[in-house]
Structure formats: C-alpha cells, structure tokens
C-alpha cells in the first residue's frame, strides 16, 4: 500500500505542475489539486475523512464561484481521478462534499459532463 501512496503523491505533484486545462477559467488545476491533496488517502484507502480534506473542499467551493471556474474544477477533479486509476473509490470521492457539509452544484463522478456545470 505504501507504493500506491507514493504513486498517488507523484501523480499529484505532476498534476500541480501541469496547471490549468483551459484558459477561460482563473482557477488552475494546481489550485484544485492543492486544495484536495489531503483527500487522496481517504479516496484510496478509506477510514476517516481528514479535517484538512474538508477544509480544502470548503476552500475550493468558496473560490470556484463562476461557471468557468466550476467547470475547470470539475475537469481538474476528473483528471485527478483518472490519474489515480483503479485504486480510486468513486463512492468515497462522491461522498466527500456531503460529509464535509459542502453543497456543490455537480456530482463528483468521472461521468459528470463538466460542460453542463453552472
């Protein structure tokens, strides 16, 4: 399991360096990934959601107020989920906002059409 966490951390570092997917949004994937980094262990291994994960989700929700920023956040989250691969528990990831008391305007899922997020 330590190898999985090392791989997840390496992927996260690459995603932070990669930056934004689109140029219409002020929000970068680096910012999204930084805010959600504390959630990786939970979505891969389960257990208790770390308080830092909830803080990151709340912060990300507060900075992603415009439609382009929300769409960008959605795209970044999907990219991170794809990078984590089969080790990702989609149900855990989808449940984080509610567990953290955050209402986001879209479902956390790789099947979400980010273009429809408002």
From Swiss-Prot:
Residues 1-25 form the signal peptide. GO terms for cellular component: apoplast; chloroplast thylakoid; Golgi apparatus; plant-type cell wall; plasma membrane; secretory vesicle. It is found in: Secreted, Cell wall. Plant non-specific lipid-transfer proteins transfer phospholipids as well as galactolipids across membranes. May play a role in wax or cutin deposition in the cell walls of expanding epidermal cells and certain secretory tissues. The keyword Flavoprotein does not apply. One of its GO terms (molecular function) is lipid binding. Keywords: Cell wall, Cell wall biogenesis/degradation, Disulfide bond, Lipid-binding, Secreted, Signal, Transport. This is Non-specific lipid-transfer protein 1. Expressed primarily in epidermal cells. SUPFAM superfamilies: Bifunctional inhibitor/lipid-transfer protein/seed storage 2S albumin. Disulfide bonds join 29-76, 39-53, 54-100, 74-114. InterPro entries: Bifun_inhib/LTP/seed_sf (IPR036312), Bifunc_inhib/LTP/seed_store (IPR016140), Plant_nsLTP (IPR000528). Belongs to the plant LTP family.
């Amino acid at each position: 399991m330590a190898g999985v966490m090392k791989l997840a951390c390496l992927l996260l570092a690459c995603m932070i360096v990669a930056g934004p997917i689109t140029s219409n949004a002020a929000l970068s994937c680096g910012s999204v990934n930084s805010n959600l980094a504390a959630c990786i262990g939970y979505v891969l291994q389960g257990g208790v959601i770390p308080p830092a994960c909830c803080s990151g989700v709340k912060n990300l929700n507060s900075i992603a107020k415009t439609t382009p920023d929300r769409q960008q956040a959605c795209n970044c989250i999907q990219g991170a989920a794809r990078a984590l691969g089969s080790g990702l528990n989609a149900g855990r990831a989808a449940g984080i906002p509610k567990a953290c008391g955050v209402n986001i305007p879209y479902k956390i899922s790789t099947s979400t059409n980010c273009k429809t997020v408002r």
